[in-house]
From Swiss-Prot:
This protein's UniProt keywords: Electron transport, Heme, Iron, Membrane, Metal-binding, Mitochondrion, Mitochondrion inner membrane, Respiratory chain, Transmembrane, Transmembrane helix, Transport, Ubiquinone
PANTHER family for the chain: CYTOCHROME B
UniProt subunit comment: The cytochrome bc1 complex contains 11 subunits: 3 respiratory subunits (MT-CYB, CYC1 and UQCRFS1), 2 core proteins (UQCRC1 and UQCRC2) and 6 low-molecular weight proteins (UQCRH/QCR6, UQCRB/QCR7, UQCRQ/QCR8, UQCR10/QCR9, UQCR11/QCR10 and a cleavage product of UQCRFS1). This cytochrome bc1 complex then forms a dimer.
Function statement: Component of the ubiquinol-cytochrome c reductase complex (complex III or cytochrome b-c1 complex) that is part of the mitochondrial respiratory chain. The b-c1 complex mediates electron transfer from ubiquinol to cytochrome c. Contributes to the generation of a proton gradient across the mitochondrial membrane that is then used for ATP synthesis.
Gene: MT-CYB
Binding site for a ubiquinone: 201
Protein name as annotated: Cytochrome b
């Protein structure tokens, strides 16, 4: 008789995805982040669900309801901070996951890569709307500034912004719809993640060497379930350290002041995980140009596979491209730092140089270095 997990219509799908899945034997810890992202998503949905039970999406009571969660709800503070800092863990895993894909040439799986980009945009949209919900100063002004960017779109811009706001400014209608979207999007993300996995399992996983591993595969369970659990324990320990010891480390003090449309904070800035894109936006003096650069800073990932000129898929044996990759990482860290600084000299210049370098590395230098490495292989 066949094992139930191999014959049952529903359990069979789980079995083929997480138990008997043939996996390259040499994948490193960089392949842990996919499962970590799944755990982050489940954690965010669960904590978010419990927060939604006590939250009110009304401008008059939103701030008070978040305070009520922290003060009066049993373990409300831990749920709230696990949710807020869980978003940071989510983005750390996302950036690592995308970086891994670029480094080891996983972008050759076009469908998986493109669904991944859609996922990245969706998660960013969800996080942005979630940041608006506590209705503090930075929530309100962040929402105002970022939604206002759409007014740069020619002809329809102003109408589009007012349509999103549901009025002539960020107000009750905006908060209510942002809550509705913030609630529904994680489920859409879950569906997209399932499609992401579906496409990945059509081709099988990539591996650090970048060559086919069909001749050397092992079952996912128990080998990689154990390996993923180690990564999970490290991630959850880090998250709980953050939540229990310094929950406000990554937040903005301005968000502990209730939203006031008559008082603008001195430095409006988003959460840390958007700062690199925010720095690119600010480095262009023109409004429409800045918005385009902001979108392109993420959309550029879509043309990474088209710019792959090297005969080798992975960067494992390409030292020149490795140097370039780590320069890109350093550049993104610089942009993140600049995004949190005030708009004044020398930060403006540093931001502009870092933005130029960001696009230059991906669009110009990486393809050139790939070609040079091809020539070096002939010698």
């Amino acid at each position: 008789m066949t094992n139930t997990r191999k014959s049952h219509p529903l359990i069979k799908i789980i079995n083929e995805s997480f138990i008997d899945l043939p996996t390259p034997s040499n994948i490193s810890a960089w392949w842990n982040f996919g499962s970590l992202l799944g755990v982050c998503l489940i954690l965010q949905i669960l904590t978010g669900l419990f927060l939604a039970m006590h939250y009110t999406s009304d401008t008059a009571t939103a701030f008070s309801s978040v305070t009520h969660i922290c003060r009066d709800v049993n373990y409300g503070w831990i749920i709230r901070y696990a949710h807020a800092n869980g978003a940071s863990l989510f983005f750390i895993c996302l950036f690592m996951h995308v970086g891994r894909g670029m480094y080891y040439g996983s972008h050759a799986f076009l469908e998986t890569w493109n669904i991944g980009i859609v996922l990245l945009f969706t998660v960013m949209a969800t996080a942005f709307m979630g940041y608006v919900l506590p209705w503090g100063q930075m929530s309100f002004w962040g929402a105002t500034v970022i939604t206002n960017l759409l007014s740069a779109i020619p002809y329809i811009g102003t109408d589009l912004v007012e349509w999103i706001w549901g009025g002539f400014s960020v107000d009750k209608a905006t908060l209510t719809r942002f809550f509705a979207f913030h609630f529904i999007l994680p489920f859409i993300i879950s569906a997209l993640a399932a499609v992401h996995l579906l496409f990945l399992h059509e081709t099988g996983s990539n591996n650090p060497s970048g060559v086919s591993s069909d001749s050397d595969k092992i079952p996912f369970h128990p080998y990689f379930t154990i390996k993923d659990i180690l990564g999970l324990l490290i991630a959850l320990t880090t998250l709980m350290m953050l939540v229990l010891f310094s929950p406000d480390l990554l937040g903005d003090p301005d968000n502990y002041t209730p939203a006031n449309p008559l008082n603008t904070p001195p430095h409006i800035k988003p959460e840390w995980y958007f700062l690199f894109a925010y720095a690119i936006l600010r480095s262009i003096p023109n409004k429409l140009g800045g918005v385009l650069a902001l979108v392109l800073s993420i959309m550029i990932l879509a043309i990474v596979p088209l710019l792959h000129t090297s005969k080798q898929r992975s960067m494992m044996f390409r030292p020149l491209s490795q140097c370039l990759f780590w320069l890109l990482v350093a550049d993104l860290l610089t942009l993140t730092w600049i995004g949190g600084q005030p708009v004044e000299h020398p930060f403006i210049t540093i931001g502009q140089l870092a933005s130029i370098l960001y696009f230059s590395i991906i669009l110009i230098l990486m393809p050139i270095f790939g070609t040079i490495e091809n020539q070096l292989l002939k010698w």
